[in-house]
């Protein structure tokens, strides 16, 4: 639902903004499909994330719609931003759709597969998460153990003010 809500917000408010401020500080992630859908609002059609397994086999997650805005994204990040939030921020950088400000993100560049009763009949009420893939953002960069390096390092107590200034918002 997150990706759908994000796109509806962009579609309904694009004429009222000069830039989109996306605050992902402290966001531990979520579904990769939501990150791809949100990123697609800025980038348009294309392969926006790549998963590579231990054998080197890769698969792309593609966004097949058109971009919903020509305005840039200004993404706020910190060390608590991980996983799908890093996919979004790294994708913004990789597609040239905007900038990232704040501090370096967590650096979780891997994805897990969940095995539970729905796909593994011998787990009776239990579940197991197995790290199965390393992911690469649009542009080919991994965040694993590195994080997303911001375009501009900004102390967290100044990040929102900096984003507003960069967006051209009148203060």
Residue map of PLM features:
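Conserved P-loop NTPase
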Residues: 112-117, 126-162
């Amino acid at each position: 639902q997150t990706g759908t809500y994000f796109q509806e917000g962009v579609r309904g408010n694009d004429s009222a903004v000069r830039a989109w401020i996306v605050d992902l500080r402290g966001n531990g992630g979520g579904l990769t499909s939501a990150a791809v859908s949100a990123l697609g609002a800025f980038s348009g059609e294309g392969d926006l994330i790549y998963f590579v397994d231990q054998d080197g086999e890769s698969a792309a997650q593609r966004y097949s719609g058109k971009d919903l805005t020509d305005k840039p994204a200004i993404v706020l990040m910190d060390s608590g931003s991980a996983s799908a939030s890093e996919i979004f921020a790294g994708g913004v950088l990789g597609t040239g759709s905007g900038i990232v400000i704040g501090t370096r993100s967590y650096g979780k560049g891997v994805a897990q597969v969940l095995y539970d009763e729905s796909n593994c009949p011998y787990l009776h009420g239990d579940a197991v998460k197995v790290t199965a893939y390393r992911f690469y953002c649009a542009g080919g960069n991994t965040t694993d153990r590195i994080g997303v390096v911001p375009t501009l390092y900004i102390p967290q107590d100044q990040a929102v003010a900096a984003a507003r200034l960069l967006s051209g918002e009148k203060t």
